[in-house]
Amino acid sequence: HPFVGVVMFLGFFIQFFRYWKYNLMEKEDVKWLTSVGQILKGEEVGDTGKYNAGQKIMFWLMTVCMLTLLATGFIAWRPYFADMFPIPLIRIALLLHAVSALVLIAGIIVHVYAAIWIKGTIRAMVEGVVTQAWAKAHHPRWYREIMAKKKAKDEAAGRL
């Protein structure tokens, strides 16, 4: 368990530095968050970038949970480190470790459920690609940014 946890954390650590800048909350995210009812009805709300507010919250929730799991796992890791800490601290660490794992697992379940709820999202999660129509409908600002980059690249290459 501890060694697998360290490998899991290292994998997440790499992903964190790859995606953190896309997951900073913006003004437009407030509109998305206050319109969750409409979103659950299938309506698109706001000028969403690469990630919507729900995805950003999930990213930061996973970050906090992974850091908590690492720190509390380190404290409780027998026989290597646990002898460095008093028993009451180890007990608190184990409780926080369990709660953090529970929150992480619940978050993943909600994430998968949301992906199933919104058609086309499973493909995005599994294959890492979406159709242009899907991007335009669900993440319009990101779609415009991608199209602007494509247009600039085409113009630079002499294609129109």
Where are these regions (language model features)?
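Membrane-embedded alpha-helical bundles that constitute the cytochrome b-like, heme-associated redox core
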Residues: P2-L160
